[in-house]
Amino acid sequence: MNALPPAIFLMGPTAAGKTDLAIELTKVLPCELISVDSALVYRGMDIGTAKPSKTQLAEHPHRLIDILDPAQSYSAADFRSDALAAMAEITARGNIPLLVGGTMLYFKALLDGLADMPAADAQVRAQLEADAQAFGWQALHDQLAVVDPVSAARIHPNDPQRLIRALEVYRVSGMSMTAHREQQTAQSTEAAASGRQQLPYTVANLAIAPADRKVLHQRIALRFEQMLDQGFLDEVLALRSRGDLHSGLPSIRAVGYRQVWDHLDGKLTRDEMQERGIIATRQLAKRQFTWLRSWDDLHWLDSLASDNLSRALKYLGSVSILS
């Protein structure tokens, strides 16, 4: 018997069928679901995130869905803390945590831990905010591009919270956020080589996707069209009508939402919005595949196979998760 309690990771690109398989697994295994998705944490963002239906959530509850207002931010560190607490509760009941989603950074943070970043510094933050008021957020973004080009490439100039944090880390520690993360990766690699691990669970890693990438692209396009038919534009209009949300927030920068927001701002026609939304979703899937290709001990399932449940159960049995 394993010394550590079991957990299951069910990963994959967007539109691959992760939720359906996860629900099927809960019907035959003592599993409880934890969502691993940076967009599903937000309330009022249902259609564009392909959130499980209210019926599905009532019958098969998912933790870490609908836990935040769209005006709030949610970090990988927040996720790790919340997920560890949920996993402990599930394990204490004698059940298996089944973590399902496509935010690969969250899976990685949970598995390997996070770099020890310096604490917030009120004086440094005040100076950065004063600089932003005087010179604009683009000027701060230009500063970040000099000291941490990797972070600058992923942080939008209109995302003040993340922009300030990245510059704050550099000014307080003298190291970029990217350097801190690289240091953590090296430490995690060393820990794995020595048999130590950050996550106190025996994890079985499952991934699901269509074997043919063209099929996934077709599914992405169809799902985006269905979202529009289901009222995606009205959903974003409701968010805009609040008056306290803007395109720089992490929630509104989620794939699909930023394109619809730009359309409602008059920056894109409806056809352009739909095309760019589909392209952005395909790019997201490509990034997810990049993460998954480097994942150790990963068992793949084909989205189009009719026997994925039995295949998943066979694999879980083979790695002693079910013993």
From Swiss-Prot:
Catalytic activity: adenosine(37) in tRNA + dimethylallyl diphosphate = N(6)-dimethylallyladenosine(37) in tRNA + diphosphate
Binding positions for substrate per the UniProt entry: T14, A15, A16, G17, K18, T19
Annotated function: Catalyzes the transfer of a dimethylallyl group onto the adenine at position 37 in tRNAs that read codons beginning with uridine, leading to the formation of N6-(dimethylallyl)adenosine (i(6)A).
GO molecular function: ATP binding; tRNA dimethylallyltransferase activity
Assembly and interaction partners: Monomer.
One GO-annotated biological process of the protein: tRNA modification
A UniProt-annotated Pfam family: IPPT
Gene assigned in the entry: miaA
Disulfide bonds: none
Residues that hold ATP according to the record: G12, P13, T14, A15, A16, G17, K18, T19
CC cofactor: Mg(2+)
Name of this chain's protein: tRNA dimethylallyltransferase
Region (Interaction with substrate tRNA): 37-40, 161-165
Database matches in InterPro entries: Dimethylallyltransferase, IPT, P-loop_NTPase
Organism: Pseudomonas syringae pv. syringae (strain B728a)
PANTHER family: TRNA DIMETHYLALLYLTRANSFERASE
Keyword line: ATP-binding, Magnesium, Nucleotide-binding, Transferase, tRNA processing
EC number(s) on file: 2.5.1.75
Top-level EC class: transferase
Residue stretches in coiled coil: none
SUPFAM superfamilies in alphabetical order: P-loop containing nucleoside triphosphate hydrolases (SSF52540)
NCBIfam families from the UniProt entry: miaA
Site for Interaction with substrate tRNA, residues: T103, R125
